Swiss-Prot record:
The gene is lsrE. One of its GO terms (cellular component) is cytosol. This is Putative epimerase LsrE. It comes from the Bacteria. The active site is at D52 (proton acceptor), D199 (proton donor). The chain crosses the membrane at residues 14-34. A divalent metal cation binds at H50, D52, H81, D199. It comes from Salmonella typhimurium (strain LT2 / SGSC1412 / ATCC 700720). It is an enzyme of class 5 (isomerase). It is a single-pass membrane protein. Belongs to the ribulose-phosphate 3-epimerase family.
Length: 254
């Protein structure tokens, strides 16, 4: 699935990634069924796998380390979100393990520019070649949006968390919409070439209004695996974007 990214420029990779509106939080499923999930997602032409790496220090939970990135099949696009105390070390390890997209927390590192600049020089393997590492910045619900201004030219993905990582306390829908509007206003003419992502315990009912506002992608985990209906739920969530006409992505009928 990721062979179409081989040899593309950073700008072309971002444009192609923007056509995929869903990143699947693969760690939310039952790990014993991981092989089945991956087969189902491949049949659906769903290349983006989202992995939350938590170290128990940045937030209370502990999930997996960079080693887990390398355990996933190379055919997928590995979308890694770092929620760790030492983002520099983790980012290097994730690149070595084959992460294609790496999103840092704005609150997690005083040396964001250094880490993002380094990531901008890295490439990772895909089927048939290599692609540049795509860089993202993520913000907790209470983090001022203007912290991203100095690094806007160093990121391709801007991710707004709708929950407080590790705690599960969610933003009110009205507050989330206001935050999206504020981000779009902040970006202004710099909106082009940026993928805006919402991550955190969204329901399908929330999607239409967020899509209408102009977001590009959502990250979803538990909602997609609910009732052991990954295929049906993935199709349904992706169809919300297709109906809205927000992307050129066409869900597979497999």
């Amino acid at each position: 699935m990721n062979s179409q990214f081989a040899g593309l420029t950073r700008e072309a990779c971002v444009a192609l990634l923007a056509s995929y509106p869903l990143s699947v939080g693969i760690l939310a499923g039952q790990w014993i069924a991981l092989h089945r999930y991956l087969q189902q997602l491949e049949a659906l032409n769903q290349p983006l796998l989202h992995l939350d790496l938590m170290d128990g220090q940045f937030c209370p939970q502990f999930t997996v380390g960079p080693w887990a990135v390398g355990q996933l099949p190379q055919t997928f696009i590995k979308d890694v979100h770092l929620m760790v105390a030492d983002q520099w070390t983790a980012a290097q390890a994730c690149v070595k393990a084959g992460a294609h997209c790496i999103t840092l927390q704005a609150e997690g590192d005083i040396h964001l520019h250094h880490t993002l600049s380094w990531l901008g020089q890295q490439t990772v393997p895909v089927i048939g070649g290599e692609m540049p590492v795509i860089r993202g910045i993520s913000l907790c619900p209470a983090t001022p949006l203007d912290v991203i201004i100095p690094i806007l030219s160093d990121v391709e993905v801007i991710q707004l968390l709708a929950v407080n990582p590790g705690y599960g306390s969610k933003m009110r829908s009205s507050d989330l919409h206001e935050r999206v509007a504020q981000l779009l206003c902040l970006l202004g003419d710099k909106r082009e070439g940026k993928i805006i992502v919402i991550d955190g315990s969204l329901t399908q009912d929330q999607l239409p209004s967020l899509i209408a506002q102009g977001i590009d992608r959502v990250v979803s985990g538990s909602a997609l695996f609910r009732d052991d209906r990954l295929v049906e739920n993935t199709r349904s969530w992706r169809a919300m974007f297709k109906v809205a006409g927000d992307t050129t992505f066409l869900p597979s009928t497999a």
